[in-house]
Amino acid sequence: MANRRQSRRRGNKNRNSATVRRAPPNRATQSSSGKVKFVKWIAASPTKLIPHIGENETSYGVLFDITGTTFPELSSLMSRHSRYRVLSLGARIVPYDPNCLGAHSVKVFAESVYDSSATPTVPSVHYLQSNGCRVVPANKQLSSPPSSDVNKYYEICSDDAVIGRIMYAWNGPGLSTARVGFCSFEVYADLEFDGIRE
């Protein structure tokens, strides 16, 4: 009996130790390897409806313009380092937001960030300078983007942690800004810092 009780206790202990604790949102975490993972939750209302000129003529895009959103946590990190290598940067719509009707069928894409010295043909060399940045949009005519390059519709820029972006969410016919409503987004950034300031 005593052995059975001890093994039961051990089993409970192991189960409890396997509990995963999630970090709260809106936090920048820094590892010892010189990489930063940043996540922030924001919300936005759609500003206008744009026809999608492409394979499906009845498809429409909803424009979410949240340019000028500030990230104080990222700003403090950038003030301590001269540059970052951008591993990934973009936004995901939060699924099943009760305020965002049809969120489960909305797709979100994001454009990359480039340093002024980099070229669009070298996507592996992305640098955010702490004193400014430059956006290299894949398509200047955002109102009618080609269907063959759907993952390059947005502009994202960072200048002292002010990151603005233009987000398109594609959906089927009958879509309207009123139907979509107020949507939540998860903005994410995986950065590798370099050039620590003295």
Curated annotation (Swiss-Prot):
Q: What is its main location?
A: virion
User: Which residue ranges have biased composition labelled Basic residues?
Assistant: 1-13
Q: Which GO terms describe its cellular component?
A: T=1 icosahedral viral capsid
Record region (Disordered): 1-32
- List localization entries: Virion
Instruction: Name the UniProt key words of this record, in alphabetical order.
Output: Capsid protein, T=1 icosahedral capsid protein, Virion
The protein's role, per its UniProt record: Capsid protein self-assembles to form a bacilliform icosahedral capsid with a T=1 symmetry, about 50 nm length and 20 nm large.
Name of the protein described by the UniProt record: Capsid protein
What is the organism of origin for this protein?
Answer: Mushroom bacilliform virus (isolate Australia/AUS LF-1)
